[in-house]
Amino acid sequence: VHYQTYDVTEMIQSENTFTIELADGFYSSKTGCFNKAKVFGYEPKIIAQLELVNEKDDIEIVGTDGSFLWSNDSEIRYADMKDGETVDSRMSATYTGTARVTEYQGIICADNNVPVIEKEQLINPRVVHCPDGNTVLDFGQNIAGYVEFTVTGAPGHKVSLICGEKLDDNGNFTIKNILLSGDYDTQRMQREEFI
């Protein structure tokens, strides 16, 4: 298992909450061209620590252990690296349980890849209104990253953000080129739903 290290100095305030959102990720999400799930394991786990260094170079470590509060009722209702994410903004984590500590017998070592950093922000995409009534935000290139937007609506309204690469022959958005079968009404491929 590889770990990554980030400098979070600028995020530290006088009072802080150490919150971790854990989803399947590479470990147990669907991967590859055959959309196979749980290739590396079934239960995602996490180990984390926050090292606080004061002016005298004294180090205080806050690490994950059995005292961490746990919740399965947050606004993130579904998350898969390939299939996307469902967010229900009516929900809020209650943190009524405590984390289960497990034993890991493998090797934990530093990640030998370049760090994940935000390289650029793509703003003001070209807006395309498709014949079928859908709206496409065209950034003009394939991207890897996250999407940030503001939307207003009444409780229970649903907004779907589906990431893809092309329009079909009729000028409508499609993800059939990246699905194995079916269409995006029944498949969750790269979909983010906000309720």
Predicted regions: what is each one?
Residues V1-I195:
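Extracellular/oxidizing-compartment recognition motifs
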